[in-house]
Amino acid sequence: YYGYKEHYAYGEIKVMASDDEHMGVFLELKGAGSRNMEYVLQAQNRDWYSFLNRCLDCGGVIRRFDLAINDMCGLLDISTLSEKYKNGGADCRCKNYENVQGGKLSGKNRNLASTLYIGSKSSTKYFCLYEKQKEQATKKKHTDIINRFEIRLRDKKAVQAVEELLLTYNPHGLVFYLITDFVEFP
């Protein structure tokens, strides 16, 4: 695990530690881990803001920070957005994109789920739009989320986003800015 000697898990919350002080402690919160952490914070009468502030106060380094918008009513049509992007129907700072179709080809449910990546996956900022409900159906899981729009930030962009979030306490404004500053589908 990333060169760390010690590994701890609580649900999907992963913590790694090392004798090497320069490596610090590594906290990994993927999808379910973020929700697990939210339950822990609620039990402590804390929120994400206090947690992130505490991490920074203790000298924490933020390598990656993702923000997500859950589309509960199907406003985002990933296939249509992919076509628009491919045909130049979007104004974007980055011309890189990738459209991926995935799913199972056997059984009753042969629906493929679409994923659209906007921007380079190796950059400090890119977007991932995908059909969450179809993705979960291939795992035989149910969700009310039809589509998800993720903003994936790394290194300097991640730190800037966290600092802005802690300064303004306005996640909606931050998400709106990050999207409209990067891409527009007229």
Tell me the role of every PLM-derived stretch:
Residues 1-186:
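Structured, helix-rich domain cores that form ligand/interaction pockets
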